[in-house]
């Protein structure tokens, strides 16, 4: 599967937050532990996450299911939970393992901008205590990001929507090297500014 530019951008936002939790808290004007027990999120940097194809495949399937069924839930097709879906996609849970899932959706009656939607998703998930805890979890190393554009009906109204599933996991003892190769074809220094935002 190919990660879209908007999905890669979201991964960069998540990794920026994990590398400097205090700056992310200042950026959104909300304490790292708002709504959580003091010290749940330590404020010290945690390792960045690397993309995993199986986690992405599970996330993609769930985001599509959300839009196809107009159902926003961690319980998915056939009553599956996130662990069921990542294993079905081929992710092996071996040794010491864990998984987590964040979901978000945003909609508009006009055209939806997927990059703006990603920014909205990231901020909204930060503002939710449980989702923030997942984002800053020190026991995860891999992520699957799937943003799907489509129509979503909520409370009797149908929207042009962005449905997002983030599957976080860690399994076994493998180590990863990760990074982004970027050609700044329009010379706007976008990724340089991203790390200084």
Predicted regions and their residues:
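A short alpha-helix/helix-coil micro-patch that ends at or immediately precedes a cysteine
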Residues: 2-69
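A well-ordered secondary-structure block
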Residues: 57, 61-170
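Alpha-helical architecture
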Residues: 13, 125-126, 186
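A short, Gly/Thr-enriched small/hydrophobic beta-strand-prone motif that recurs across taxa
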Residues: 171-189
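Short regulatory "switch" loops immediately downstream of catalytic or recognition motifs
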Residues: 16-32, 106-108, 147-153, 183-188
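Conserved small/polar residues in nucleotide/adenosyl-binding loops
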Residues: 195-197
């Amino acid at each position: 599967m190919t990660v879209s530019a908007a999905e890669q951008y979201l991964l960069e936002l998540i990794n920026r937050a994990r590398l400097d939790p205090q700056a992310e808290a200042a950026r959104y004007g909300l304490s790292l532990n708002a709504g959580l027990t003091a010290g749940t999120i330590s404020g010290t940097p945690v390792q960045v996450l690397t993309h995993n194809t199986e986690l992405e495949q599970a996330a993609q399937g769930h985001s599509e299911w959300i839009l196809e069924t107009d159902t926003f839930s961690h319980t998915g097709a056939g009553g599956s939970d996130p662990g069921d879906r990542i294993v079905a996609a081929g992710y092996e849970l071996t040794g010491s393992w864990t998984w987590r899932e964040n979901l978000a959706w945003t909609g508009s009656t006009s055209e939806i901008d997927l990059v703006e939607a990603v920014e909205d998703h990231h901020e909204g998930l930060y503002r939710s205590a449980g989702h923030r805890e997942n984002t800053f979890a020190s026991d995860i190393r891999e992520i699957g990001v799937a943003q799907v554009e489509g129509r979503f009906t909520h409370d009797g109204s149908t929207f042009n929507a962005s449905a997002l599933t983030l599957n976080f996991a860690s399994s076994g003892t493998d180590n990863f090297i990760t990074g982004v190769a970027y050609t700044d074809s329009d010379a706007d220094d976008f990724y340089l500014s991203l790390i200084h935002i």
